[in-house]
Amino acid sequence: MPITTSAQPRKQRLALFNAPLHLRHKLFNAKLSPELEKKLGVKRLPVRRGDTVMILRGDFKGVTGKVVRVDLKKVRIYVEGATRTNSRGQTVYYPIHPSKVMIVDVDMSDKARQKIIERRKK
């Protein structure tokens, strides 16, 4: 289901900015590693807390770690190993867009997620 039917970039951006949380979850798709893709028969899955991902772009390129937190409002994920030090000297997780990561290992503890994979299979 498309969020908007307009072709104007400003309206596309506005629709993404104002999208409700249940539709924002669709923006969290990340590609799977080639091994997982063959195993599950799916190319992309939404990133969830507990998944192991590899960062493909940015300063933390090549870092592999578990997803610690998922922020639906900001459309960002937080990964172990992708940290920086803030002005107070505390270590904080660096926000990363889900499209810039590749899922290396999937947390299959949720039965609903298994149903999603079965539904999406090629």
Swiss-Prot record:
One annotated GO molecular function is: structural constituent of ribosome
The cysteines joined by S-S bonds are: none
Tell whether Disulfide bond is among the UniProt keywords: no
GO CC annotation, single: large ribosomal subunit
Residues spanning the signal sequence: none
Q: Which Pfam families match?
A: KOW, Ribosomal_L26
Alphabetically ordered keywords of this record: Ribonucleoprotein, Ribosomal protein, RNA-binding, rRNA-binding
Kindly give the PROSITE patterns that the UniProt entry links to this protein.
Answer: RIBOSOMAL_L24
What is any one GO biological process for this UniProt entry?
Answer: translation
UniProt cross-references to PANTHER family, sorted A to Z? 60S RIBOSOMAL PROTEIN L26 FAMILY MEMBER
Which HAMAP family does its entry note?
A: Ribosomal_uL24_A (MF_01326_A)
According to the record's subunit comment, the protein's assembly and interactions are: Part of the 50S ribosomal subunit.
Similarity comment: family membership: Belongs to the universal ribosomal protein uL24 family.
What the protein does comes down to: One of two assembly initiator proteins, it binds directly to the 5'-end of the 23S rRNA, where it nucleates assembly of the 50S subunit. Located at the polypeptide exit tunnel on the outside of the subunit.
- According to UniProt, the name of this protein is Large ribosomal subunit protein uL24
Species annotation: Pyrobaculum arsenaticum (strain DSM 13514 / JCM 11321 / PZ6)
List the lineage, top down: Archaea, Thermoproteota, Thermoprotei, Thermoproteales, Thermoproteaceae
